């Protein structure tokens, strides 16, 4: 079976990860002790993708890492804390203190070997490992610094396996730490090179969804994580239940036209708050309409400001595949200016019969839009403002980093922005000119 190994790192990654396991355990009928109480064979058919079965109990293929014990203790004390394999909790005692260098070079580097041992052990218990998924944030120290260190180590050891990350990016207005722009830029520098698919999430977009759409007056991180997990559950549906787009590789092949442009926006419809049930069933056209809506995007970049290179939509529930295909065509024809014309039929749709808990139908959207450059631009501006004055740099250089590394990360991020811009402006006619430029770049 095509297994995925899930890794969660840092405070944010562990909280999202813990919630993700609650959601999919619920969907697969696995209770907090790991025994199965489901009602459908479909729940078990591909349960091996995420769970290891031993003597009738299902254990998540999850690895939890952090540089301080706090978050892990709360995961362990949480509703599904007993589900995880105790050896798979790997933690230090010092913490990274929101410092990327501590996570990547000093504290994290000391712990990384014990994490890799657990990764190897999980990978060996798989029949046919298809890849890794990592939940982490880019603004802190552990998830970003140690997370990217782990990604590059796994890349060395398993070069042909897909590496998919769910990365919580810094938000424009909601900032947790002052040095977020540094940590995020250094992380993106790594993710461009070492990850295959990066799903960009960000707290501000999630807060907006909570305020505007769900009308929650004071949303908590729990509510944000609920939204993230709804989307993660939707993206992984295809891997966990029978469907057409059934591997992470197929997803990557359909979504990534150029190797560096693998940062995706995620949308979900219908948006519901925790514990509320959907009172009226939505139709396929309504779902399609909603998932392309900028308000449904879980990342603070507006797709109307760019063009989609590619997109994938995963519908869940009982509906006609024909209707889904018609709607997809419809979207492309009506909004053709928002799709690049040099990739014909660039939306991939797939349908899975099993809806998420409490909904009749839902849909998850992954878009590779050039508008994602807004997010990188924003971080880059904040980065430059601080870096020009060398603010806070001593925390990083004190851990043995070099200023060169900051400069490289900055220029890599700016290159990424201009690549997105280049393809946004490209038309089908001038393709010839592009190829020559590309070849020139290759030669240089």
Swiss-Prot record:
Binding residue positions for GTP: 11, 68, 137, 141-143, 203, 225
InterPro entries in UniProt: Beta-tubulin_BS, Beta_tubulin, Tub_FtsZ_C, Tubulin, Tubulin/FtsZ-like_C, Tubulin/FtsZ_2-layer-sand-dom, Tubulin/FtsZ_GTPase_sf, Tubulin_C
GO molecular function per UniProt: GTP binding; GTPase activity; metal ion binding; structural constituent of cytoskeleton
This protein's name: Tubulin beta chain
Location of the region described as Disordered in the Swiss-Prot/TrEMBL record: 424-444
Family per similarity comment: Belongs to the tubulin family.
UniProt GO BP: microtubule-based process
Role description: Tubulin is the major constituent of microtubules, a cylinder consisting of laterally associated linear protofilaments composed of alpha- and beta-tubulin heterodimers. Microtubules grow by the addition of GTP-tubulin dimers to the microtubule end, where a stabilizing cap forms. Below the cap, tubulin dimers are in GDP-bound state, owing to GTPase activity of alpha-tubulin.
Bilayer-crossing regions: none
Cofactor(s) in the UniProt record: Mg(2+)
Keywords, sorted A to Z: Cytoplasm, Cytoskeleton, GTP-binding, Magnesium, Metal-binding, Microtubule, Nucleotide-binding
Assembly description: Dimer of alpha and beta chains. A typical microtubule is a hollow water-filled tube with an outer diameter of 25 nm and an inner diameter of 15 nM. Alpha-beta heterodimers associate head-to-tail to form protofilaments running lengthwise along the microtubule wall with the beta-tubulin subunit facing the microtubule plus end conferring a structural polarity. Microtubules usually have 13 protofilaments but different protofilament numbers can be found in some organisms and specialized cells.
Key word GTP-binding present: yes
Compositionally biased tracts (Acidic residues): 427-444
GO cellular component terms listed in the entry, alphabetical order: cytoplasm; microtubule
Cellular localisation: Cytoplasm, Cytoskeleton
Keyword Oxidoreductase carried by entry: no
Pfam family for this entry, one: Tubulin_C
Origin species: Achlya klebsiana
Sequence positions that bind Mg(2+): 68
